[in-house]
């Protein structure tokens, strides 16, 4: 059972609306309490992308600052967070300071008179990175089929598609193979993606890039295009080329997370 299935209908509707709008959110669940606390294990809240509580309840205001900080960390790193909001004297007994992490737990000070401890698990839900595959070539079809298993939101489009800006990560693979290459590049460059890859030889891209810059394309953006697309695995068949491209995309996505 997923967290959304354990929430009320109102909360589930809010989750669905956030997903439809490609907005990040997080579930916060109290998993353990010690001493006197307002909220008990099992209490849940839905957190917005700024870390504030949209719906639900986690007790009084003593834990809100720690929850917000942990939620922002979860969104930035795409990793769940476990926080323990603990009275200062208990932190001293444990030999940890507020703000430090030990054993996978981030500790925060609870200054409330109740002197209780609340452990809260925060699980982020981020929009899947978008993979836009331009063209209907065999490589394009193989890439769409293979990438579906690797947590990408896939869009298979024609070369003349209008790519609207998006807040999520976007990777564009141009696999038009001579059928509207320039049109596809103009659409891809205008959308400001995290990466543009071109399925074609470096010689062919050199000719296309000159045409693009002569027509007014930003030289820096053109030079940032990865051509030929994919890691060098001596790929020959469309499936092998698609595999090399997907490996490069996964490497790029993981590198982006490691930088935060």
What is the predicted function of each stretch?
Residues 151, 193, 221-222:
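A generic structural signal for alpha->beta connector loops
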Residues 1-171, 204, 210-213, 248-260:
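Segments forming oxygen-rich coordination pockets for charged ligands
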Residues 199-260:
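Adenosine-phosphate binding glycine-rich loop
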Residues 136-137, 177, 234:
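Glycine-rich Rossmann-fold phosphate-binding loop(s) that bind the pyrophosphate
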Residues 28-29, 53-54, 195-196, 228-230:
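Short glycine-rich or small-residue beta-strand-to-loop segments that form or flank ligand, phosphate
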Residues 164-165, 171-198, 203-207:
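Rossmann-like adenosine-cofactor binding region
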């Amino acid at each position: 059972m997923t967290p959304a299935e354990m929430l009320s209908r109102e909360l589930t509707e809010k989750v669905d609306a956030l997903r439809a709008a490609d907005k990040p959110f997080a579930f916060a669940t109290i998993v353990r309490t010690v001493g006197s606390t307002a909220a008990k294990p099992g209490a849940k809240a839905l957190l917005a992308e700024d870390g504030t509580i949209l719906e639900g309840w986690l007790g009084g205001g003593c834990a809100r600052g720690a929850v917000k900080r942990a939620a922002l960390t979860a969104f930035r790193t795409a990793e769940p967070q476990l926080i323990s909001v603990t009275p200062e004297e208990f932190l001293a007994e444990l030999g940890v300071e507020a703000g430090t992490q030990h054993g996978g737990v981030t500790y925060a000070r609870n200054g409330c008179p109740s002197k209780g401890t609340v452990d809260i698990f925060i699980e982020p839900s981020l929009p899947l990175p978008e993979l836009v595959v331009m063209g209907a070539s065999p490589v394009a079809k193989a890439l769409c089929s293979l990438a579906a298993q690797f947590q990408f939101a896939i869009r298979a489009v024609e070369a003349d598609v209008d790519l609207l800006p998006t807040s999520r990560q976007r990777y564009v693979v141009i696999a038009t193979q001579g059928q509207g290459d320039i049109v596809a590049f103009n659409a891809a460059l205008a959308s400001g993606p995290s990466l543009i890859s071109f399925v074609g030889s470096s010689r062919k891209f050199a000719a296309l890039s000159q045409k693009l810059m002569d027509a007014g394309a930003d030289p820096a953006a053109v030079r940032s295009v990865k051509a030929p697309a994919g890691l060098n695995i001596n790929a020959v068949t469309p499936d092998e080329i698609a595999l090399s491209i997907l490996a490069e995309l996964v490497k790029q996505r993981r590198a982006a997370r490691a930088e935060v």
